[in-house]
Design a protein with these regions (language model features):
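N-terminal secretory targeting modules
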Residues: 1-36, 42, 46-53, 164
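Histidine-centered active-site loop/cap adjacent to the catalytic His
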Residues: 70, 188-210
Length: 210
């Protein structure tokens, strides 16, 4: 019962955010040059504080997002006429909900193909799913996610990106690991989400290409 209530609440929150994005997309003061799309790790990414670019940056992340929802609502996330690059970071919630990898890949490929069709001059950066900390104290938040599952999905992402000249795979996973192969303590708030220090590492990896 409690889990269902939480799911219902999250769905309503997601719908509110998507509605807001659609409204904002109608009359932007500036056309977006760089768009960041994905789940909560994107939504909470302070791009304007940690990244520098002459291009106008827009964040269109949504907490709790799975790949099927991004596919369904893609028009709320990608907009404009002068989009230079799109940064896509998504997949950890698919793992958390035990969605089959093939289904995740089908959704991501559909998203990539839709963007390439509508934005043929836009480059897409498919960012690796980030590692988690599998320490016992984070179990409730991390749930069934494991770095083994994440690495398997990242390998599939890398292969998917190689199939399209308009897509690049960006490995951030490796930069966030500690000496035992877990998401480093300094880089996380709860074993899953990033701390400011973690976002600095993410920003460093992306700064070279923004």
């Amino acid at each position: 019962m409690a889990v269902q209530l939480l799911e219902d609440w999250l769905l309503k929150e997601q719908e509110k955010i998507v509605t807001t994005y659609r409204e904002l997309n109608q009359a932007p003061l500036k056309e977006p040059g760089l768009i960041f799309i994905g789940d909560s790790i994107v939504e909470y990414f302070p791009i304007h504080e940690l990244l520098q670019s002459p291009k106008h940056m827009v964040n269109r992340g949504v907490r709790g997002y799975k790949t099927d929802l991004l596919r369904k609502h893609l028009d709320a996330h990608v907009f404009g006429t002068v989009v230079d690059q799109i940064f896509l970071l998504i997949g950890t919630n698919d793992i958390g909900k035990e969605i089959p990898q093939k289904e995740t890949l089908d959704n991501v490929e559909a998203v990539l193909q839709a963007i390439m069709r509508d934005f043929p001059l836009t480059h897409i950066n498919l960012i690796s799913v980030l590692p988690v900390s599998q320490e016992e104290r984070y179990k409730q938040k991390v749930y069934v996610r494991t770095n083994e599952k994440i690495q398997a999905l990242n390998q599939a992402y890398q292969e998917l990106a190689q199939a399209y000249h308009q897509v690049s795979y960006v490995d951030v996973y490796s930069s966030l690991l500690d000496e035992v192969g877990q998401l480093a303590e300094a880089y996380t708030t709860d074993g899953l989400h990033l701390s400011v220090a973690g976002y600095r590492i993410l920003a460093q990896a992306l700064q070279e290409i923004v």
